[in-house]
Amino acid sequence: MQQPLIILGIGIVLALVSNVESGVLRKPVDEHEYEKWTNARGNEAAVPPPKYKMLRYAKKAINEPENRKMSCLFCTFAVDGVQALIAQNSTDNEIAAFLVNLCDLFDVEQPHVCKNIIYAFKDEVVFVLERSVFTPEEICGAFIANCGHSDKPLTHMWNITIPGGKPPIKPWPKIPDNKPTFKVLHLSDIHIDHQYVVGTEAYCQLDSALGTYAMCCRDYSQDSQGAPTNLKDKPIYVPAGPWGMPYLCDLPYQTFESAMKHISKTFKDLDYIIITGDFEAHDSWDYTEDLTRENMNNMTNVFLEYFPGVPVYVSIGNHEGVPQDAMAPHTMPEYDTRGPQWLYKIMSEMWSHWIPQEALDTVQYRASYAVYPKPGLKLISLNTIYCSEFNFYLYVNEVDPDATLEWLIEELQDSENKGELVHIISHIPPGDNYCLKGWSWNFFEIVKRYENTIAQMFYGHTHYDQFMVYYDMDDPNRRPFHFNWISPSLTTYDWLNPAYRIYEIDGGYEGATYTVKDAKTYFANVTEANMKNKEPEWVLSYDTREHYQMADFSPQSWSDLSDKLWTNTTLFRDYVRLYYRNHYNNECYTDYKCRYTFVCDIKKGRSYDESFCDHLTK
């Protein structure tokens, strides 16, 4: 997520709704009353109405140490500055141009990015603001820590009815010896960049005065119209290699193809593949429906070519949306023109190679589905973009978009009644603060209710190699009752080596547990491949059970591991190394706040709740 850019898009909240605030018409403010009005709203200093004074104010503010955090500065400046423009009765185009010029002036991004990111989110955010009750200040506070007044949009709570009658809790099943197992490939966050150019700047933040460029390893020497830019004659600090770069760069196509060739030759006995979302590159300012359709079609053909006869089960990612994360539910006014039905239709067409028509019908409605990859095992692909904080359509009505959690409960209840076990694959881990609080907390309760039925859960989105434990806070011992596998990304974005995971799962016989028996993570050192000018060598990074000396993969074992990470510096250092796939040297091993962040992320089974971490003390 390129947060500074998205915040600029959010700046459109005020930029293009002119006289709308909190869903009611706002009376224009006279120029002579402007300073008194802005100071009354708690601003340290009023922004003078004339446009060029605003830009000088912004430049001064940027150079003050306390305002180095660009996300907050640009969000709050957009709020105050645009309010001043509104007071001058500026047109929508003038206001949009102000934001584009602001982005250009301070070198926040490439010129075409500055323009496109604002117009990409314009219609969605304007539409939502006109129908919501949140002020711009609440929105700034919601998305940026210590900025604005509130995080209310992200922490709105609502409840879904969960059936009672929970069966007695079963202990985590023990996998018997000498029973059949099967192999599953887990890919996530592939993010292929078809505009990756060898030799371009991989460390492009150095070309930005504020270090905010979000997408490197591309040719920015000319703009989208072919005119030369101010980067045309700049020296290259870190040239992009042919096999990808562990910087803010997505994956070159040939590295993706290298991974597919390696996996298909090495693992000829895959039973199926799970992909937990995100095929598109991180250039969200250039997303179009046609480009998404083309990319998804190409990706489907690749898997059909390299893995013929192997089912592929996919969950939708936030980067599949156009704009990014934009997936309006059916309750949204003007759904016919704003809904993602075009995307869901594409997915149903592509996925028809691997899932039956009954499941495709559900895909076309809510981009979720249920299939049976093995007898007695139901696999549920769950659309968690309905909990994304950047799916702005949800701020009109956050309550269970497209009744997806209600549908999930029905599927789980049906499986409980039949004695089936369930795997859930999805994109956004519900414990991540990217997931809205109301959705996350309801999902947490669903997992607790159906903990006997849900055998495993698999996620992506973060790009990191990590895990997440669910704790029963009603239990005096904080019983760990479930956990998430979170797969490392295939993309190198950002500061990572590409990776994938192979699971060996107990199953294929009567009474199987359908839990993971072993998990092995593989990666490629792209820096080494570039230096040798040879195709990457895909090698075993680690065997999870062996590396962490785990007796099993029960929630208790994962909880025990997280406790050891808190107390054992050597183990924690190793965890961080694997987290970044042997690339990033994070020097936070003895820093309390840094270690707290890593370990608390493990222990948070639901978003916006650090009560799970209150025992982590110095």
UniProtKB/Swiss-Prot annotation:
GO BP terms, alphabetized: ceramide biosynthetic process; sphingomyelin catabolic process
Cofactor descriptive note: Binds 2 Zn(2+) per subunit.
Top EC group: hydrolase
Domain Saposin B-type: 68-151
Keyword Kinase part of the UniProt annotation: no
Localization per Swiss-Prot or TrEMBL: Secreted
Function: Sphingomyelin phosphodiesterase (sphingomyelinase) that converts sphingomyelin (N-acyl-sphingoid-1-phosphocholine) to ceramide (N-acyl-sphingoid base) and phosphocholine at acidic pH. Displays its enzymatic activity when secreted. May play distinct roles in signaling.
Protein's recorded name: Sphingomyelin phosphodiesterase 2
Organism: Caenorhabditis elegans
